[in-house]
Amino acid sequence: MNVGIDFGAVLAFGLLAKFDIDKQKELQTKVNEKMERKKEMKGASKTMKEREAILRSLPLEITVGVDGTTRTASVGELQAGAKQHIIIVTGPRKACTDALIGANLLKMDFAMSNILVVPYDMDSDSGERPSGGFGEKPSYETQPYIARPASDDWADYIKGEMNDAVKQSGEQARKEGIALVVANNGKVIRRGVGKVPWRQMVQQLENEVNPSPEGPLTWL
């Protein structure tokens, strides 16, 4: 009888010990995964900060006269000197076109809010993307608030942003396009995939330089 009781106790202890070990392994796995995610997020944050610095050095072609006269200036110069905010839209041609048509409805808001819109059509290679002048284009592509990438150096920057978007949102980012909202302090305050909510982004840029007590708007 005593032997039976002792055997049962040993068996129960063994099962409890195994359960405890399994739980410890599961907990350690979760801890390791959490640490790895934090490490990846820290690395991604560092990469994005480095990319912000690269963005400031990239040149844009802007319209400076009613006759269509253009000049070239870096993003950093436009931010520091003219206090310009920048919204970059990139993706396939259709995504860029849809975004520019939507932007055209708010063109007065862009003028009043010092916002430049930078379209980057990823369907075109560097040979097809014009480096100077606006040529014969639809009116929504030739508005004064439209700025054009003025060098091939933009390709690497856009590629990095798109790769990050694909990691977070899947391949739909390549199909639907992405938008980046850059305040005139050089900070990228919003990244989004798909249809561009222009009115909300204009308001968010206003909140960035003139914070309201209600806090920032959400990305729609």
Which role fits each region the language model picked out?
Residues 1-220:
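Non-catalytic interaction/Regulatory regions outside core domains
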